[in-house]
Amino acid sequence: MQQQHLMQMNQGMMGGYASPTTVTTDLIQQYLDENKQLILAILDNQNNGKVEECARNQAKLQHNLMYLAAIADSQPPQTAAMSQYPSNLMMQSGARYMPQQSAQMMAPQSLMAARSSMMYAQPALSPLQQQQQQQAAAAHGQLGMGSGGTTSGFSILHGEASMGGGGGGGGAGNSMMNAGVFSDFGRGGGGGGKEGSTSLSVDVRGANSGAQSGDGEYLKGTEEEGS
């Protein structure tokens, strides 16, 4: 009842003004400017002691304020309708963009699945790669051992030849040693680095012992002839 009474009072006050349906922002701005001027006039009237003019300006200011209040009361239904429209629009747009969001969410899942499948596929290839690496390492090690064995065979040959040359003391012993060394070196080259070096050392030592025994017999023969 009170609200209806207030609405009737507002309508009575708005009789001499424009109806709320024709209200524009320019009209509201005019009322605000007029109210500002009325307030300044009221203050001036109070300072100068003009009571009648002050009362008249106050009544007009109150009338304008009531009119603006009535306009404000008539606006909420329209604002409510406007507020409902964006909400409906948002709901429709949300329903429209839901498939796109679901597709965007499924895209990372598919990427994760692809990555996991790649991770599981890599260990299947790793044993083959390890085997190839082991074979390559073994082949490299065999080449290194073969080259090392050949080098050691030549060093043994050189050492035994020098020992034989120092211990023989005669041309026959050196010639026998050289013959045995070169012949055994030829055999060792065909049979392998390790076996060749062993046979070379044995033959060289045999040649040295033969040379020493030959020298002993020669000395014994000379002693018997002298006696």
Swiss-Prot record:
InterPro entries in the record: SS18_N
Give the compositionally biased regions (Low complexity).
124-139
Q: Where in the cell is it found?
A: Nucleus; Cytoplasm
What keywords is this UniProt entry annotated with?
Activator, Cytoplasm, Nucleus, Transcription, Transcription regulation
Tissues and organs where the protein is expressed, per its UniProt entry: Highly expressed in internodes, nodes, developing spikelets and developing anthers. Expressed at low levels in roots and mature glumes.
State any GO CC term: cytoplasm
Stretches for region Disordered: 124-160, 188-227
A GO BP entry is:
seed development
Q: Where is the composition biased (Basic and acidic residues)?
A: 217-227
- What does gene deletion cause? Reduced plant height, and short and narrow leaves.
How is this protein organized at the quaternary level? Interacts with GRF4.
| Biological role stated in the UniProt entry | Transcription coactivator that plays a role in the regulation of meristematic function in leaves, stems and inflorescences. May regulate leaf size, length of stem internodes, and seed size by promoting cell expansion. Transcription coactivator that plays a role in the regulation of grain size. Component of a network formed by the microRNA396 (miRNA396), the GRFs and their interacting factors (GIFs) acting in the regulation of meristem function, at least partially through the control of cell proliferation.
Q: Further notes on this entry?
A: Plants over-expressing GIF1 exhibit increased size of multiple organs, such as leaves, stems, panicles and grains.
Family per similarity comment: Belongs to the SS18 family.
- The identity of this protein, by name, is GRF-interacting factor 1
The protein's organism comes out as Oryza sativa subsp. japonica
- Gene name tied to this protein: GIF1
